[in-house]
Amino acid sequence: MEWEPVIGLEVHVQLRTQSKIFSGAATAYGAEPNTQACAIDLGLPGVLPVLNKEAVKLAVCFGLSVNASIPPYSIFARKNYFYPDLPKGYQISQYNFPIVQNGHLDIENEDGTTKRIGITRAHLEEDAGKSFHEGMQGYSGIDFNRAGTPLLEIVSEPDIRSAQEAVAYLKALHSLVRYIGVSDANMQEGAFRCDVNISLRPKGEEKFGTRAEIKNVNSFRFVERAILFEINRQKEILENGGTIVQETRLYDAVQDETRSMRTKEEAHDYRYFPDPDLLPVEIGPEFIEAVKNQLPELPWEKRKRFAASYQLSNYDVKLLTTQIEIANYFETVLKIDKTIPPKLAANWINGDLAAALNKNNLSITQSPINAEQLASLLHRIADNTLSGSMGKQVFETMWGGEGDADTIIERHGLKQITDTEALEKIIDEVIENNPTQVEQYRSGKDKLIAFFVGQVMKATKGKANPQQVNELFKKKL
């Protein structure tokens, strides 16, 4: 029997606010344990939560970017459960009346086709604390710094049918929240976490199977591997006549497997009820319009503009716009020097610069070569001061911190030889020293032109303009 996976994702995005969702405590990452938790975060008696308006604004911003509806009011509810890192014994979340409803996000599959993934809802909630075990000598500690940090939980429709589609959706969502500035979505810091709901059904059937939930997967690669394992696990059970248990599972990256954590809870297990300490949130059309007017250019809008304005291929555009920082770097280079061809800038950013960054595990914002320096290099390639190979030499030297292109060219004597008289002298010597190859070329072996050009490049230590040399050879021969 052929089985069809049915996958829905719940993504927890930490919102980019200076303070927590219901208190004035800071949200900065990496502080000493329990130095950023106030009485409200700890749920001490007599304290009352106050909603952070910026969190509401960021949630609305996200909703508008995915063409969702923003209801005129939403309600906070208490989600009741016990866990050591939940000091109040309940989590303030949203249940029946979320702040964002019925949106969608288009993803591009590996074959270039586009698929629309529905977004059921996105709701605001507070994060819990975090357990830690190192250095506790048989005990577990609790760090409440994260407690009360604002989260936007984004729930997709069960429209995803493969691990590859799940990763494509997550990458599109990750890019979007960073583009619009609602989150830095740093996965290493837990600012972008994913729960995967997955079931199997016979292909062609509409009824869903029993689902399992895989909690807190924090990398694209692990999401893909967890889904692939879970599909195979459920398939094996069903084909052997067994039944799937509705449960919460954990992905073990070391063993590359999912393991059962607990039986999956239903909504009634959490005993949701409206939080009596928080009034309903009323969101008027004026507020929505104000947020809409501040929306930045969205990823798909930027891709369309790059393709039209810069005449770039879909491949180049996709690489340049995956991260907002790369797109900004590219446009900064072109603004600094309008004589640089966009294709030249794209080739260097997507090629040599990307390779160097990957090799050194750096992001574009950590690049030793800033946009001004790269522009200085590309200017000298565009005006034929440097050949492509010499440009790579300058790039490597620039990466080492020796300054801009002109400084490096002057210091290392890397200026390209374009003087026709000087080049013709070297060409004459090459022709004189290689009579056999000259005869073969004149007999119809046109590919030998590359040999002649190579000899000149060798003689000039790469400083000759290869195109100019090619043309001069053809005239001579």
Curated annotation (Swiss-Prot):
PROSITE patterns named among the record's database cross-references: GATB (PS01234)
Reactions that this protein is recorded to catalyse: L-glutamyl-tRNA(Gln) + L-glutamine + ATP + H2O = L-glutaminyl-tRNA(Gln) + L-glutamate + ADP + phosphate + H(+); L-aspartyl-tRNA(Asn) + L-glutamine + ATP + H2O = L-asparaginyl-tRNA(Asn) + L-glutamate + ADP + phosphate + 2 H(+)
Highest taxon, organism lineage: Bacteria
Top EC class of this enzyme: ligase
Keyword set, alphabetical order: ATP-binding, Ligase, Nucleotide-binding, Protein biosynthesis
Keyword Ubl conjugation set for record: no
EC number(s) reported in the record: 6.3.5.-
Record's keyword annotation contains ATP-binding: yes
Pfam family, one: GatB_N
GO molecular function, one term: ATP binding
Coiled coil: none
GO BP terms in the entry: glutaminyl-tRNAGln biosynthesis via transamidation; translation
Family listed: Belongs to the GatB/GatE family. GatB subfamily.
Known function: Allows the formation of correctly charged Asn-tRNA(Asn) or Gln-tRNA(Gln) through the transamidation of misacylated Asp-tRNA(Asn) or Glu-tRNA(Gln) in organisms which lack either or both of asparaginyl-tRNA or glutaminyl-tRNA synthetases. The reaction takes place in the presence of glutamine and ATP through an activated phospho-Asp-tRNA(Asn) or phospho-Glu-tRNA(Gln).
The protein's assembly and partners: Heterotrimer of A, B and C subunits.
Record protein name field: Aspartyl/glutamyl-tRNA(Asn/Gln) amidotransferase subunit B
Organism: Coxiella burnetii (strain CbuG_Q212)
Organism lineage string: Bacteria, Pseudomonadati, Pseudomonadota, Gammaproteobacteria, Legionellales
